[in-house]
């Protein structure tokens, strides 16, 4: 419904901003990162927006750059992650830090954020890692470092790490991952973890 707002910044706090456009004031929820980069009240401002609607609530979220908006929407695509938690994640770390934690499979970086537990952190990495690799190559890849395509060893390590973070014993995780790769090679990390999870549940 709203792609962006261009107007005058009226007020701003760590969590909200009010922007006047043609005499109408729009209240937007923002991350602390966006808040820290806003101009002083009375200045012109341009914010990308996300309009979130549910049965009992309508909310408008504002972002200074498209990268933050894109990551916000990716976070919303995860089961159990709503806009409040997505903004908390963006407030806890920069976009680059979040992407690096996801690509490098470091859930401990994410569950240091208020409201993000171990299982949520693992789910974020599991569901977004391949998407982040496709849309946002790491700085090392941009600089001509080895391709982001994972080696077999790295693929296994990442899948096992995701499963152990979800609470499965390491030995069981390794066995399930290896068995899946024997029968279905060429999987991404996300696909490998999902297939291994299904196999482990079937054996319970």
From Swiss-Prot:
Chain segments carrying region Flexible linker: 144-151
Keyword DNA damage recorded: yes
Main location: cytoplasm
Pfam family, one: HHH_5
Protein's GO biological process: DNA recombination; DNA repair
Signal peptide region: none
Matching InterPro entries: DNA_helicase_Holl-junc_RuvA_I (IPR013849), Hlx-hairpin-Hlx_DNA-bd_motif (IPR003583), NA-bd_OB-fold (IPR012340), RuvA (IPR000085), RuvA_2-like (IPR010994), RuvA_C (IPR011114), RuvA_C_sf (IPR036267)
UniProt keyword list: Cytoplasm, DNA damage, DNA recombination, DNA repair, DNA-binding
GO MF annotation terms: ATP binding; four-way junction DNA binding; four-way junction helicase activity
Domain II: region residues: 65-143
Compartments, record wording: Cytoplasm
Location of the region described as Domain III in the Swiss-Prot/TrEMBL record: 151-204
SMART domains in UniProt: HhH1
Region called Domain I, residue ranges: 1-64
GO CC terms: cytoplasm; Holliday junction helicase complex; Holliday junction resolvase complex
Function field: The RuvA-RuvB-RuvC complex processes Holliday junction (HJ) DNA during genetic recombination and DNA repair, while the RuvA-RuvB complex plays an important role in the rescue of blocked DNA replication forks via replication fork reversal (RFR). RuvA specifically binds to HJ cruciform DNA, conferring on it an open structure. The RuvB hexamer acts as an ATP-dependent pump, pulling dsDNA into and through the RuvAB complex. HJ branch migration allows RuvC to scan DNA until it finds its consensus sequence, where it cleaves and resolves the cruciform DNA.
Domain comment in the entry: Has three domains with a flexible linker between the domains II and III and assumes an 'L' shape. Domain III is highly mobile and contacts RuvB.
Family of the protein in this entry: Belongs to the RuvA family.
Summary of subunit composition and partner proteins: Homotetramer. Forms an RuvA(8)-RuvB(12)-Holliday junction (HJ) complex. HJ DNA is sandwiched between 2 RuvA tetramers; dsDNA enters through RuvA and exits via RuvB. An RuvB hexamer assembles on each DNA strand where it exits the tetramer. Each RuvB hexamer is contacted by two RuvA subunits (via domain III) on 2 adjacent RuvB subunits; this complex drives branch migration. In the full resolvosome a probable DNA-RuvA(4)-RuvB(12)-RuvC(2) complex forms which resolves the HJ.
Name of the protein in its database record: Holliday junction branch migration complex subunit RuvA
UniProt organism field: Chlorobaculum parvum (strain DSM 263 / NCIMB 8327)
Classification lineage: Bacteria, Pseudomonadati, Chlorobiota, Chlorobiia, Chlorobiales
């Amino acid at each position: 419904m709203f792609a962006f707002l261009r107007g005058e910044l009226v007020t701003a706090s760590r969590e909200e901003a009010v922007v006047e456009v043609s005499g109408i004031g729009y209240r937007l929820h923002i991350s602390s990162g966006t808040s820290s980069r806003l101009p002083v009240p009375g200045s012109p401002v341009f914010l990308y927006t996300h309009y979130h609607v549910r049965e009992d609530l309508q909310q408008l979220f504002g972002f200074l750059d498209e990268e933050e908006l894109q990551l916000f929407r990716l976070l919303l695509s995860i089961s159990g992650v709503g806009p409040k938690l997505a903004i908390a994640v963006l407030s806890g770390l920069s976009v680059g830090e979040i992407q690096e934690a996801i690509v490098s499979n470091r859930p401990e970086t994410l569950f240091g954020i208020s409201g993000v537990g171990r299982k949520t952190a693992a789910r974020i990495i599991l569901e977004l890692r391949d998407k982040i690799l496709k849309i946002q190559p790491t700085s090392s890849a941009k600089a001509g470092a080895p391709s982001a395509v994972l080696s077999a060893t790295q693929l296994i390590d990442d899948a096992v790490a995701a499963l152990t973070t979800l609470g499965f014993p390491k030995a069981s995780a390794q066995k399930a991952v290896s068995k899946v790769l024997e029968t279905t090679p060429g999987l991404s990390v996300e696909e490998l973890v999902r297939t291994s999870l299904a196999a482990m549940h079937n054996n319970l």
